[in-house]
Each structure stands twice: as structure tokens, then as C-alpha cells.
Amino acid sequence: QALLLKNPTGIKIPSERTVYRVMDEIGLVHRPKRKPNGITKADREARKSDDLLKREFKADKPLEKCVTDITEIKAKDGKLYVSAIFDCFDSSVLGLAMETNMKATLCEHTLDNAYLAHPDLRGAIVHSDRGRQYTSETYRQALSKYGIIQSMNSDGGRCHDNARCESMWARMKSELLYDRYNTESLTTDELRVLILEIFHQLLEQQEDLLCQRWASSYD
């Protein structure tokens, strides 16, 4: 369409670069979507778990299917790594942990916090990518301790196998963080406090929504 505006009689399009150049010439803004680029790295020698979700992220009830992942946020004095577990039923945040490193204990603490807040998580499926944090013995032992079933991306580690979690992080970082704050002007400690406040607000919104659903069921 941009090329037709430039030349109504039509032209041959040799490449996407031509489209972007013409869009720039006529003042149309082009913002390509970022391609998923996972920060976790797989341990090729580690034992992998099966993909139990197979991209079916819909859940019929709470604490049935969950997804987890790590995201990184740049700060003034380094990077903060944030790990969370989301419920596929309503996208609620079940557990959260933050560290300045990506060791397996980060994911273990996420499980600890999720189970502490939701003991009924026992028996749930928690899906992740094949990063070494999730194939570590530390993480597997935590899953076993809480009776949680592990699921992982299919062979090849395609990002779409954990698309629900990827989209949750992308939305949170874009709408609630980067559009409002310059994270690189904050220290990791200040950023940690800010993220806790953001997730606290999300939890309050989720509780309000649950109350509305409960009330409407009795109307």
C-alpha cells in the first residue's frame, strides 16, 4: 500500500527493504515487531521433559496449567532477572522472584513463592522452555517437593511452544514498564521495588476481577 501511494501505477517490489525505504520517504512509521530471543540457554546433555501442553494454553480451571519464564530488564548498575509463574486460566501471577543472576535458584524461589501463596498448585502442570535452569536438579527437586508436573518446549526449543508466557512478559514490559519508566536510570534495587509495586497492582486488579465474577454468579 505504501508503494502504491508513492507510485499509483504500480511498481515491482524486489524486497522488504524497498517497502521500508518508501514508507520512510512518505512519512509512514515502521516499527517491526521484535523477534523472540530467549535469554535462557539449553544444556544439551541434560534430561528433558515432554511437552504436555503442545501449545494448548487454555485451561478449564485455575491451577491446572501454568507457564513460567525468565525475562531481563536493564538497570543503571546491571541487569535484573525476573522469573514468574502465570496461570493459563486467567493469566494471574502465581509466583515471582528476582535476582541479578540467572542461576537455577531463581526459578526454585519462584516455585517456592508460588506454592506458598497457592498450596493447591500441587498436581498442576508448569510449562517452561528448555533452559538449563529448568533442566537443573535444583529445579526438578523443587517440582518434586511440591508435587508439580513438569512440561517443556518440544525438541528444538521453538518460542511458540511457550508463547503464552512470552506474550505476558512482552505486554507487562511494554505497557507497564517501558512506556512509563526509564529503567536504565534506576539501580537494580530500585527496579526491584518498582516491579514489586507493578505486580502488586496486578494482583489487586485480579482480585477485583474475581470478586466481580463471584458477585455476577449470584445475580
Specify the residue positions occupied by each region the protein language model found.
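Short small-residue beta-strand/loop micro-motif enriched in glycine and branched aliphatics
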Residues: D90-L96, Q150-N153, Y178-R180
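Active-site beta-loop-alpha junctions of metal-dependent nucleic acid enzymes
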Residues: K74, G78, L96-P119, T135
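RNase H-like two-metal-ion nuclease catalytic core shared by retroviral integrases
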Residues: I39-A42, S128-R130, S136-Y139, M152-S174, ...
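Residue-level detector of anion-binding/catalytic polar loops
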Residues: V29, I148-I149
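Mobile genetic element proteins and their domesticated derivatives, centered on retroelements
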Residues: Q1, V19, M23, L53, ...
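C-terminal domain-tail junction helix/linker
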Residues: S144-I148, A170-D219
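Basic, flexible linker segments flanking DNA-binding modules
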Residues: Q1-K61, C159, S216-D219
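An active-site-proximal beta-strand-loop segment
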Residues: R55-L94, T100-M102
